[in-house]
Design a protein with these regions (language model features):
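Class I (Rossmann-like) S-adenosyl-L-methionine-dependent methyltransferase catalytic domain
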Residues: 1-117, 131-138, 142, 146-215
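Hydrophobic adenine-recognition pocket in adenosine-nucleotide-binding enzymes
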Residues: 127
Length: 215
């Protein structure tokens, strides 16, 4: 059984972080703003990232035959796999009707759904920051049920917003949460490897001590 945290046991946030008003509409205007002329992630950069993630999975002897792309947006991850790993089965999902109609995804919500069969690689690229605390807990529970191999996750934290992100290109209508808040939820079912990669605790993969984050 997959452990999960009930809302009353979720990691606490400071009051000022609870007042953030995240975006809830991901329509054509959203995609024009963040993915058109000056996107926060270009197709070339996502291709480099996908190449690296896929190669690291191969290095750890986790052959990627199946992929779930959550909040797939413009579909850059799916397109990379279709172009370079035609044998891999990719399921791309999104909660945006516009994204599903425009880019060809399935209209599914990871907070309330998971596939019947788990997959080798789950991608959750810039999704969790839009969800409520309870929504993140539900999403991570379903992600853990979806993944028996590797999870790639990117989510901007409070520190990232202060020190890392390009504030002109990044959507700032999101929840501001600390990295430790997300780690506490993820660590119940995943082991942090680094560079956004998390290994399912169901995976029987021996890692050198310095390949993963300290416990």
């Amino acid at each position: 059984m997959t452990p999960s945290l009930t809302p009353e046991h979720l990691p606490a946030l400071h009051n000022e972080e609870d007042r953030q008003m995240p975006r809830t509409i991901f329509d054509d205007a959203y995609y024009q703003r963040f993915y058109n002329e000056d996107p926060v992630h270009t197709a070339q950069k996502v291709a480099q990232l996908a190449t690296a993630v896929d190669s690291l999975c191969a290095w750890w002897d986790i052959p990627v035959q199946s992929v779930l792309d959550i909040g797939a947006g413009p579909g850059m991850w799916r397109d990379w796999y279709h172009a370079h790993r035609q044998h891999v089965k990719v399921q791309s999902i999104d909660i945006s009707e516009h994204a599903c109609k425009t880019f060809g995804h399935e209209l599914l919500d990871i907070t309330a759904w998971h596939p019947k069969k788990s997959v080798d690689l789950v991608i959750c690229h810039s999704v969790l920051q839009y969800l409520s605390n309870a929504g993140v807990s539900s999403a991570i529970k379903n992600i853990s049920l979806s993944c028996h191999g590797v999870l790639y996750i990117e989510v901007p934290t409070t520190s990232d917003l202060e020190h890392v992100v390009d504030r002109k290109a990044t959507d700032l209508e999101i929840h501001h949460r600390t990295g430790s808040w997300y780690r506490k939820l993820l660590s119940a079912n995943f082991q942090q490897i680094g560079a956004g990669l998390w290994l399912s605790r169901r995976a029987r993969v021996p890692l050198y001590e310095l390949e993963h984050a300290s416990k």
